[in-house]
């Protein structure tokens, strides 16, 4: 399966490495050329030597998305640090390029529901943390 991940921060690079290890074709797009170092970190071979692709560019630019392989992507993951950017690029992937499996990292839990209504799969670390803390505060059932 061809996976395109936008954002090579902690989350994006970890998911990219995991997907490549699982045997998927993986392309990562990030505007910071130094973010490539996260993909190489802790590996015996470079990201490219391991079969990964890295493209420097802004995901809001169609040319960068095409260079990164969006036209053949079966899964699209938007994992930049910005909720607005993630929503826009996820909708581009979904509506313009017809990708059905679009996953979006959403920091603001209030937005996650709306994103879901747009047909996007949302992952909200903040919402997950809130739920975990709330469970920790519930009295144990006897």
What is each residue range found by the language model?
Residues 1-142:
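Cytosolic regulatory regions of ion transport systems
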């Amino acid at each position: 399966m061809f996976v395109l991940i936008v954002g090579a921060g902690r989350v994006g690079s970890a998911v990219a490495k995991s997907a490549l290890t699982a045997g998927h074709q993986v392309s990562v797009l990030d505007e910071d050329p130094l973010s490539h170092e996260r993909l190489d970190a802790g590996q015996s071979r470079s990201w490219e030597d391991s079969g990964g692709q890295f493209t420097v560019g802004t995901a809001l630019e169609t040319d960068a998305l095409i260079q990164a392989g969006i036209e053949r992507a079966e899964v699209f993951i938007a994992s930049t640090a910005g909720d607005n950017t993630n929503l826009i690029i996820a909708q581009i992937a979904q509506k313009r390029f017809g990708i059905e499996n679009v996953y979006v990292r959403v920091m603001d839990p209030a937005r996650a529901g709306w994103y879901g209504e747009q047909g996007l799969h949302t992952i909200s670390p903040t919402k997950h943390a809130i739920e975990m803390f709330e469970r920790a505060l519930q009295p144990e059932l006897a």
